[in-house]
Amino acid sequence: MPELPEVETVVLSIRDQLVGQNFININVRWPKVLFNFSKQDFLDNLVRRNITNVHRRAKFIVLSFDEDILAIHLRMTGKLYFADGKTNGKHISASMELDNGQQLVFEDTRKFGRFYYYTSQDFLDKKLGIEPLGDSFTADWLIENLRCKKRMIKALLLDQRIIAGLGNIYAVSYTHLRAHETLRYRVF
């Protein structure tokens, strides 16, 4: 399952090739990949619009089009990459044609990955907590914001409304290393 560092790696690998480009079409092979919008919505709202930024928010790959965003979540087996040629793999959920001739492909063996369309990033920001790689995420912040919680430490670390982007592998590693898995967080 792609965790926050893997998602960041994907963002870094596609950003330079996407910023400044425009989608000209989308080929949807697995309709459920488009979670809260349709292919027609994509064509109406995102085609021929300049991609102004590509960044990560939690485990989402966010493509910005001025105010609108396309947020892509890889889930367990999703992969986002530029195709070298014709795309006909049986696990391809969607492919998007760019005005420079490239194809951005979303491949997902288990079919859990999703695309979300929002008219602003505010929706994601309201739904998700602090970024663990951001400057605001400090030991003081952690103590202050988790001090009075009466939940298991692993559950707190996995709660995306508190800390955005941490996954099971990091929560388990932390609790194992610290031997806190069975302790309540009131130890602060």
Named regions from a protein language model:
Residues H176, E181-F188:
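Single conserved hydrophobic/aromatic residue that forms the stacking wall/gate
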